Amino acid sequence: MKILLLSKKNFRIFAILLWSLFAILCAGHLEAVENSAKEKKETRNGGEDLAAKTQNPVGAMYSLPFKFTFDYGADNGEATFLNIQPVIPVTIGDWNLINRVIMPLIHTPGLVTGTPEIPNPVPGNGATGLGDINYSVFLSPAEPGKIIWGIGPSVIMDTATDDQLGSGKWSAGPTAVVLIQPKPWTMGLLGRQLWSFAGDSDRANVNQLLLEPFINYNLEKGWYLITDMILTANWQADSSNRWTIPLGGGVGKMFEIGSQKMNTKLEAYYNIVNPDGAPDWSMSWTLQFLFPR
């Protein structure tokens, strides 16, 4: 087992992350207590309404997902990711600001291509630690119509604790999402384009497109079917190694532990197109704490 030794800078980063997660949990718990009567009604309806809210990327609901991903079939071995993805909504007048953060904890056995978290990996003997943190904020109508949308900026911060775990660059660009929710469906597309603007001059520039089409079909008693494919294009790579395109899906379930609303899902995807040496399969399990407003 490898032991990660943190510098003072990285220790401060971890401390800030831990305090942020604690604050999110406390705020969400207070929201859940204040809305307990409403949630009891949703529970009697089998959780379908709450499932639809959870499947809306710009829904005004506090949540704290933990997504564990296992990439299998890369030339250098299997990479694992634990993405901590808090969602913090803020309502300002007729608008919602949906703050979404992705904090990746990564183990990589060496250079692994074709992953969204590390667009331009460098050779090495493997590393374990914090990757580059992604922060996105979406401006979305507080009272959406039939077509739900959100748009805003996205930033990748150079926070990786090892060169093998990040791009070595600060990157930014636009992000947007559009979806519809005709019961029992949720269907939409999230997109993001990033360009690097600062960082290690010896590392390759970042020019990455991410497209995430998603479809959910809600069943009874909180069960649902899902496909949530993350397509990426590394515009810095040659055309034969540019795209990663997965195909697959999974199943999810809304449930409770005491009064705590929860969501879990299990997914598997096969990369029908991927760069040389990239993983063939990606399997993920998500556990999400929900704090409806």
Predicted regions and their residues:
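Transmembrane beta-barrel domains of Gram-negative outer membranes and organellar outer membranes
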Residues: 33-293
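Cleavable N-terminal export/targeting peptides
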Residues: 1-46
